[in-house]
Curated annotation (Swiss-Prot):
Name recorded for this polypeptide: Uncharacterized NAD-dependent oxidoreductase MAP_4146
GO MF annotation list: oxidoreductase activity
EC number: 1.-.-.-
Lineage summary: Bacteria, Bacillati, Actinomycetota, Actinomycetes, Mycobacteriales
Record-linked Gene3D superfamilies: NAD(P)-binding Rossmann-like Domain
Source superkingdom: Bacteria
Active site: Y173 (proton acceptor)
Cross-referenced PROSITE patterns: ADH_SHORT
Organism: Mycolicibacterium paratuberculosis (strain ATCC BAA-968 / K-10) (Mycobacterium paratuberculosis)
Keywords: NAD, Oxidoreductase
Pfam family, any one: adh_short_C2
């Protein structure tokens, strides 16, 4: 499913949560296909309820360096996707610098653990605020620029396998990701007349800091039945897939080779959701 070399030549991509993990892989992969990159990340703790270490401004600088190593330009900004004004300012700055916007990868997201009735308000508000509301704010800021550019384009919403199934132990995360599925499909219809495609991807077990194996194992130890909702991947029974493998799918969706697809949900799961 990898894009063809140079398949995004001359295009511009906007990527959230780009300082490390999947977001960095998406930025570098799209740059390798020829796109200039507008990238942002909060680069700071989101909430005390999110216990894994946050990305840093230096991480975002490294993403920019890796993009530039591909011979492409990078415009980066430290911002919170919950901050509407900051998002709009970055989009405006990107349009001023590059003159167009062709691809949006709404990737920013956070995760915490707990049973539904035991979640704190802070856990709920943080996960829903970043994953669902933050994605909506990203789309609200970028879609007018894509329409104005008049080149059609592709929006890739990074959901999760949790957006297609139940995930005991993080129901708030699952709710946010199911919400992205509805948002994706509605937007696909609304943007059809502008030639802009909208699809969601649903990765499973990707090696990023968000995985936080210790926290996951702790909740499985306390509630052993939950583990049945997290099966092994048939073609990779052990370990996690890499962020670069997910980026291959994003590159394909960003380019013209996936031009027949809009309003689709693509599991990036190596078969795990078939259990």
């Amino acid at each position: 499913m990898a894009g063809q070399a140079g398949s995004l030549q001359g295009r511009v991509a906007f990527i959230t949560g780009a300082a490390r993990g999947q977001g960095r892989s998406h930025a570098v992969r799209l740059a390798a296909e020829g796109a200039d990159i507008i990238a942002c990340d909060i680069c700071a703790p989101v909430s005390a309820s999110v216990t894994y270490a946050p990305a840093s401004p230096e991480d975002l600088d490294e993403t920019a360096r890796l993009v530039e190593d591909q011979g492409r330009k990078a415009l980066t900004r430290v911002l919170d996707v919950r901050d509407d004004a900051a998002l709009r300012e970055l989009v405006a700055d990107g349009m001023e610098q590059f003159g167009r916007l062709d691809v949006v990868v709404a990737n920013a997201g956070v995760l915490s653990w707990g049973r539904v009735w035991e979640l704190t308000d802070e856990q709920w508000d943080t996960v829903i605020g970043v994953n669902l509301t933050g994605t909506w704010r990203t789309l609200r800021a970028t879609v007018p620029a894509m329409i104005e550019a008049g080149n059609g384009g592709s929006i890739v919403v990074v959901s999760s396998s949790a957006g297609l199934k139940a995930t005991p132990g993080n129901g708030h995360y699952s709710a946010s990701k199911h919400g992205l599925t509805a948002l994706t499909n509605t937007l696909a219809i609304e943007l059809g007349e502008y030639g802009i495609r909208v699809n969601s991807i649903h990765p499973y077990s990707v090696e990023t800091p968000m995985i936080e194996p210790e926290a996951m194992m702790e909740i499985f130890a306390r509630h052993p039945s939950f583990v049945h909702s997290f099966p092994p991947m048939p073609v990779q029974p052990n370990g996690f897939m890499t962020a670069d493998e997910v980026a291959d799918v994003v590159a394909w969706l960003a380019g013209d080779g996936s031009g027949t697809l809009t309003g689709t949900q693509i599991p990036v799961d190596k078969g795990a959701l078939k259990y």
